[in-house]
């Protein structure tokens, strides 16, 4: 569990199934998704059951973002590359909790965890050019636009 001032990041578990189902299948979220598709509860149950607290097992970690013990979003590390010490990072916050600094705090916590605890050297985010909220969030945290959809943060930046 990673604890910030207002929010907590914890690894996903089966109790998060209904929230995961609602977020993954919210058509509003498809607009900026790399993989817009509907998931069944069975598929998501398998995902949760096969998740690990060790990033090296499946090359990813999914954290639930909690505010006052309520689920408000997810933040992920994915495509973990142990050789080059890098990973992708993605975040989604429930619409009701956007623009309240929870995404920023979550990103800050996971960046610090990634560089200090996982010893990563860089993080990247694939962001749709029309997703101005995400672009602003990631740039605020030092990510630089390197290509059309790619934003990168290096440990020494």
Predicted features by range, described:
Residues 1-17, 26, 66-157:
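Acyl-donor (CoA/ACP) binding surface of acyl/acetyltransferases
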Residues 15-18, 56-58:
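Short acidic-aromatic low-complexity motifs
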Residues 19, 43-46, 50, 105, ...:
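Alpha-helical elements of Rossmann-like donor-binding domains used by nucleotide-donor carbohydrate transfer enzymes
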Residues 22-23:
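Conserved catalytic core of Hanks-type protein kinase domains
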Residues 28-50:
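Conserved GNAT-fold acetyl-CoA-binding loop/helix
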Residues 36-37, 60, 154:
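Sparse recognition of residues in long alpha-helices and their boundaries
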Residues 42-45, 53-56, 96, 123, ...:
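Short, intrinsically disordered/low-complexity patches at protein termini
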Residues 51-64:
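A short helix-loop-beta-strand connector motif used in the catalytic cores of GNAT acetyltransferases and
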